[in-house]
Amino acid sequence: MPDLLNNLNKRGLIKWGGKQSSDYGIVVQDCPAFDKPRRKQTVFNVAGRNGSVLFQEDAFEDTTRSYNIWIDEQTEEDSGGIETGRLDQRVADFTAWLYSVKGYQELSDNFEPDYYRLAYYSGGNDVSNELITYGKSTLTFTCRPERFLVSGKTPVTVVNGDTMENPTLFVAKPLIHIEGSGNVIIAINGVGMTATIDDYINIDCERMNAYRLPSENMNAYIQ
């Protein structure tokens, strides 16, 4: 709990699209809401039957993450190492950053440093002049429903007979890299999968695709 409280009181920082908010003199005013994604589900009402029939999928809808921000036009020391500049130039640089990046990008902040999301920015921010030298706005990113562990970027080596456990309560869809030759059996929750390999194979569980770089399709070698 103390670590969480310390994170909530930090000077906010966003990282997205290969850059971070402090590069543009952007200050995150407060911790964003911890919005949770909605489960994909369908509710059917049947005449003459009490209640509803519920069909729930093992999938969730996109969610959003919004940041209240200030664009700081103060001194170099006050703005985190950014040279003093006019507010309109700050706004131009800031919006160029947002609009020049396409598609889902890694989004992280220092409020939840152990996690990152995949998010895109679809536009619509209004930056207003407030107190002459400040710009005020809200950034809203559309995010995939998952929160990814930063620790998950570090490869874990597993040898014959070893097991791995998912550290979360949610379904994991890892990227598996197998080196060797012959038939390899991978068991996930008791369900076996056989991969016939020569040298190596990559299995992307998220995209349900087996391949070798640069673009060799290896799905026929998975059973």
Protein language model features and the residues they cover:
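Polar/acidic, low-complexity leader/linker segments enriched in S/T/G and N/D
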Residues: M1-N45
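Intrinsic low-complexity, intrinsically disordered or marginally ordered coil/linker segments
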Residues: P2, K136, T140, R144-P145, ...
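Residue-level detection of beta-strand-connecting loop/turn positions
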Residues: L13, G18, F111-P113, G190, ...
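Short amphipathic beta-strand/extended segments with alternating polar/hydrophobic composition
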Residues: K19-Q29, Y116-S122, M193-D198
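Oligomerization/assembly interface segments of phage tail-like spikes and tubes
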Residues: F44, S52-I82, T133-R147
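Long, hydrophobic/aromatic-enriched structural stretches that serve as scaffold segments
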Residues: T64-N110
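Short beta-strand and beta-hairpin "edge-sheet" elements
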Residues: S100-R147
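Intrinsically disordered, low-complexity segments enriched in serine, threonine, and glycine
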Residues: L149-Q223
